């Protein structure tokens, strides 16, 4: 069946509506015939269903593919994903991201699409803002957002992107009887009082004992407890530090301190227990509840804090998610926004 390229679409005669749309849900029926996207047209040409003309000449498949690549940015990436999904038995149509995909056993006219697919190359940085825009588009119509990353060998890895419901079971005491003294040393804080050290460690899983009487705290833990009025922190010259002075000094030691501290505070306020995730290459590992330091459960999440202008390097993101999966955790990214802290959960998905 003959078809013709018109701008960035391919038009097929009217009889194609019954053969391709009614039976395979390709394209969009128009009064003049069936309108296909370039991706749909190339796929149907690959299957030997249509021949495509351009400027009065029937194109060989290779010429059609090259022409489509000129007309549509990232054509080959999207074609690779489209072909893969079609050959898995899914019905696929253009969407507000790249594609919308119908669940197995369903199709246009029978049910709603389930997933929005967003296609990226492993080589291209992925701006966080682009990812959030695609996620919002999917959420607005209650669809699952799927990130399809095509590597240099044209293998596809699919990721589920969603907003997690982070809610812990820690009923955080405010420690009304504690107003302990602590010292900001070179890059951490030590609580000197034995009773306060014991209470903070055993009842909130803060810090790590320096010995049987004293507790050492991370910078983000220290700022949180200082802000809550639980600690009085002095520097090594025995000068009192308020939250601003502490944060300024901590930021000189750790450039990402303010970002991490905002996320730490938000996590504690959500009733979860964040601890360092250094051994996993992330900012935090997170527990829903810790009843006692002697009975530490499995942490459920790894969380890495990122600013709104962050750009994902996809091989790095893939490595982080693979590591999280290998230790039975979910990989979350914490995003500092004007309204607080937002979270996205990115995990591998089997289609």
UniProtKB/Swiss-Prot annotation:
Keyword set includes Zinc-finger: no
InterPro entries, per database record: tRNA_endonuc-like_dom_sf, tRNA_intron_Endo_cat-like_sf, tRNA_intron_Endonuc_cat-like, tRNA_intron_Endonuc_N, tRNA_intron_Endonuc_N_sf, tRNA_splic, tRNA_splic_arch_long
E.C. numbers: 4.6.1.16
First-level EC class: lyase
Cellular component terms (Gene Ontology): cytoplasm
GO biological-process terms attached to the record: tRNA splicing, via endonucleolytic cleavage and ligation
One Pfam family cited in the UniProt record for this chain: tRNA_int_endo
Alphabetically ordered keywords of this record: Lyase, tRNA processing
GO MF: lyase activity; nucleic acid binding; tRNA-intron endonuclease activity
Active site (record annotation): 287, 298, 329
Catalytic activity: pretRNA = a 3'-half-tRNA molecule with a 5'-OH end + a 5'-half-tRNA molecule with a 2',3'-cyclic phosphate end + an intron with a 2',3'-cyclic phosphate and a 5'-hydroxyl terminus
Family: Belongs to the tRNA-intron endonuclease family. Archaeal long subfamily.
Purpose of the protein: Endonuclease that removes tRNA introns. Cleaves pre-tRNA at the 5'- and 3'-splice sites to release the intron. The products are an intron and two tRNA half-molecules bearing 2',3' cyclic phosphate and 5'-OH termini. Recognizes a pseudosymmetric substrate in which 2 bulged loops of 3 bases are separated by a stem of 4 bp.
Subunit structure: Homodimer.
Protein name: tRNA-splicing endonuclease
Species of the source: Methanococcoides burtonii (strain DSM 6242 / NBRC 107633 / OCM 468 / ACE-M)
């Amino acid at each position: 069946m003959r078809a013709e390229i018109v701008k960035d679409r391919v038009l097929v005669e009217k009889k194609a509506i019954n053969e391709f749309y009614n039976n395979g849900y390709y394209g969009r029926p128009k009064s003049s015939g069936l309108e296909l996207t370039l991706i749909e047209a190339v796929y149907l040409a690959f299957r030997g269903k249509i021949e495509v003309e351009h400027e009065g000449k029937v194109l060989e498949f290779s010429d059609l593919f090259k022409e489509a690549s000129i007309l549509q940015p990232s054509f080959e990436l999207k074609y690779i994903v489209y072909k893969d999904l079609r050959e898995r038995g899914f019905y696929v149509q253009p969407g507000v991201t790249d594609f919308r995909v119908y669940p197995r056993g369903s199709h246009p006219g029978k049910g709603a699409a389930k997933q929005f697919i967003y296609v990226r190359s492993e080589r291209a940085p992925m701006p966080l803002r682009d990812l959030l825009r695609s996620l919002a588009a999917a959420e607005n119509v209650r669809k699952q957002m799927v990130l399809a990353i095509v590597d240099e060998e044209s293998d596809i890895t699919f990721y589920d992107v969603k907003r997690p419901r982070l809610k812990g079971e820690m009923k955080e005491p405010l420690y009304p009887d504690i107003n302990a003294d602590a010292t900001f040393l070179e890059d951490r804080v030590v609580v000197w009082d034995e009773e306060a050290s014991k209470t903070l460690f055993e009842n909130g899983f803060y810090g790590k004992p320096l010995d049987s009487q004293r507790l050492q705290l991370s910078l983000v833990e220290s700022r949180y407890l200082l802000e809550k009025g639980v600690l009085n922190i002095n520097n090594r010259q025995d000068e009192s530090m308020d939250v601003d002075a502490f944060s300024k000094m901590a930021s000189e030691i750790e450039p990402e301190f303010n970002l991490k501290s905002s996320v730490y505070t938000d996590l504690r306020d959500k009733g979860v227990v964040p601890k360092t995730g250094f051994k996993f290459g992330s900012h935090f590992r997170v527990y829903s509840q810790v009843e006692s330091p002697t009975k530490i459960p499995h942490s459920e999440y790894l969380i890495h804090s990122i600013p709104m202008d962050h750009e994902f390097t996809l091989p790095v993101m893939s490595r982080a998610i693979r590591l999280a999966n290998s230790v039975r955790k979910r990989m979350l990214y914490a995003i500092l926004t004007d309204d607080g802290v937002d979270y996205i959960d990115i995990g591998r998905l089997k289609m």
